[in-house]
């Protein structure tokens, strides 16, 4: 079966009278203490691990054994000067180099459902590059979750055009470091669901 985004997903037994919320925790893998706390949370949760984090196989095996779903958090070029991290997909790269970086990232650990962008506001707003990325992921059976780091992202439009599994986040829960703000955004998330 080629649809890894289905094969590697955690089954959820839905009752039709309820709405459901998917929570994705990204930037995983760099802080061992946070990782050990997060994997003990109830769930299942979807944990997205940075492609350049250390000990990825060990960390993702632990997360998976605790019942959590896995994603690959792939660095992509942002607007501005911030460094997205090692192995980032950059807008001035040719398809061959993009493909090499993508292949290296996809081999970091097994059993994930797809990728989401780490940063990437410049990359995800480029139609040609997103067509290349989304078609490459579709061929390999992975989904793309757009972190929506820019309102100019073309990911959803490209996913529809290519009949590829592409989804976008609705709300960032913690882009403001405040418990009060996170609770407010959780309430907004419930309203959307």
Regions found by a protein language model. Give the residues of each.
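Juxtamembrane proline-rich low-complexity "stalk" or linker regions positioned immediately after a signal peptide
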Residues: 1-4, 8
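Glycine-rich anion/phosphate-binding loops
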Residues: 52-58, 92-100
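Catalytic domains of cell-wall/extracellular-matrix polysaccharide-remodeling enzymes
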Residues: 95-186
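Active-site beta->alpha N-cap acidic-glycine motif
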Residues: 9-86
């Amino acid at each position: 079966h080629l649809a890894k985004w289905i094969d590697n997903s955690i089954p959820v037994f839905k009752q039709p009278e309820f709405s459901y919320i998917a929570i994705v925790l990204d930037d995983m893998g760099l802080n061992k203490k946070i990782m050990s706390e997060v994997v003990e949370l109830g769930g299942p949760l979807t944990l997205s691990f940075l492609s350049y984090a250390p000990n990825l196989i060990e960390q993702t095996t632990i997360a998976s054994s605790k019942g959590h779903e896995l994603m690959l958090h792939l660095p992509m070029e942002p607007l501005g000067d911030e460094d997205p991290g090692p192995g980032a997909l950059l807008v001035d790269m040719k398809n061959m180099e993009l493909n090499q970086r993508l292949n290296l990232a996809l081999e970091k650990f097994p059993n994930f459902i797809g990728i989401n962008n780490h940063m990437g506001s410049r990359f995800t707003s480029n139609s040609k590059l997103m067509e290349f990325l989304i078609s490459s992921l579709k061929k390999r059976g992975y989904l793309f979750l757009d972190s929506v780091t820019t309102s100019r992202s073309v990911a959803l439009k490209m996913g529809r055009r290519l009949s590829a599994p592409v989804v976008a986040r609705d709300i960032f829960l913690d882009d403001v470091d405040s418990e009060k703000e996170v609770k407010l955004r959780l309430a907004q998330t419930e309203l959307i669901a």
